[in-house]
Amino acid sequence: MPQTRLFFRSNGAPAREAFSRLEAAFEEDGLPLAIRELDEERDIHEVSIYASEDWEGVADRMRSCLTSIAGLSEIETEELPEIDWVAHSLAGLKAVRAGRFFVHGSHERGQHRAGEIPIEIEASLAFGTGHHGTTSGCLEMISRVVPREHPRNALDLGTGSAVLAIAIARLAHIPVLATDIDPVAVRVARENVRLNRAAEWVETAAAPGFHHPAFARRMPFDLIVANILARPLIGLAPAMARHLSPGGSLILSGILTHQRRQVIAGYVGQGFRHLTTLHREEWVTIHMKR
C-alpha cells in the first residue's frame, strides 16, 4: 500500500517539542515518525510522520496536537511510491561485527573469523540487521552477559528480525521465546530462525506486550532482552518485573541518550538495579538486574 509522508519544518526546540507530542499521540497507532536536521547553521529541522491510509485524518490529529507550538510551518504531504524501503536501503550493506557475532547477508556467507558466531539476516520488513546502534549494542551486551551469567530461559521481546533471539540461542544453546506485536515481523523472524538453524531453541509468537499464552507457559525468564522504544519500555517495567526471575538480567535498548535516566528510574522503582550502559552514537543499551 502506498504511503503518504506528512511533514513540517521549524527551528530545533519547537521541532523537538512537536516530535515528542506526536510520539505520544500516535504511540498506539504504530505510525513511523522521524526528525532530522536540514540546516545546522540556521537550526532548521524537519519532522515527518508516515501514513498508509486516511492521511487526512492523521493531518487533522497532527494539527490538534501542535496548535500551541509557535513557529511550525504548514503541514505538507508527499506521496511515496510503493517500495519496500527497508530492503531498498539496506540491500548490499556490509556485515556487522558486534561482540561475538558476525551479522551478514547471503553475499557475505562464510566470511566470519575464527571464534565468531555468524548470523545471516537479509534486509526485510522487520527491524534488526545489526547496523543500527541499538541492535549492535544489544549484541555486544549479550556477548558480555550470557557467558558470565549462564541463563537457562530467555525472552526477546519485540524481536523484529529475531537477530537477538538467534544470537542468544547460538551462543548459549538455551530456549528463547521471541515475540513481536507485528505478524509480518514474526513471519520474518521465523524464517530467519530456520535459516540460522536455531529452530531447536527459538519459539516465535505474535503478541502485544506480554499478552500471549506462551508467557504463562515459559515464565519466569532469567534473561529478557527488549529493543523497542523508551516510552513503551517504561510502561512495561511492572510486567518485566513479574516475568523475570529474581537475580535475572534485563537488557534494554531503543533508548536515546537523553532518555536513559528516565528509563532507569522506571525500572529502579520496580526493584531493578542498574549495572552497565553501552553507548552507540545517540543510542544506549542498558543492563539491569532484579
Curated annotation (Swiss-Prot):
Record's protein name: Ribosomal protein L11 methyltransferase
Cell location: Cytoplasm
GO terms, molecular function: protein-lysine N-methyltransferase activity
Keyword S-adenosyl-L-methionine belongs to the record: yes
Example GO biological process: methylation
Role description: Methylates ribosomal protein L11.
Annotated keywords: Cytoplasm, Methyltransferase, S-adenosyl-L-methionine, Transferase
Catalytic activity: L-lysyl-[protein] + 3 S-adenosyl-L-methionine = N(6),N(6),N(6)-trimethyl-L-lysyl-[protein] + 3 S-adenosyl-L-homocysteine + 3 H(+)
PANTHER family recorded: ELECTRON TRANSFER FLAVOPROTEIN BETA SUBUNIT LYSINE METHYLTRANSFERASE
Gene, per the UniProt record: prmA
Highest classification ranks of the organism: Bacteria, Pseudomonadati, Pseudomonadota, Alphaproteobacteria, Hyphomicrobiales
Binding site for S-adenosyl-L-methionine: T135, G158, D180, N227
EC id: 2.1.1.-
Top-level taxon in the UniProt lineage: Bacteria
Family under the similarity heading: Belongs to the methyltransferase superfamily. PrmA family.
GO CC term, one of those recorded: cytoplasm
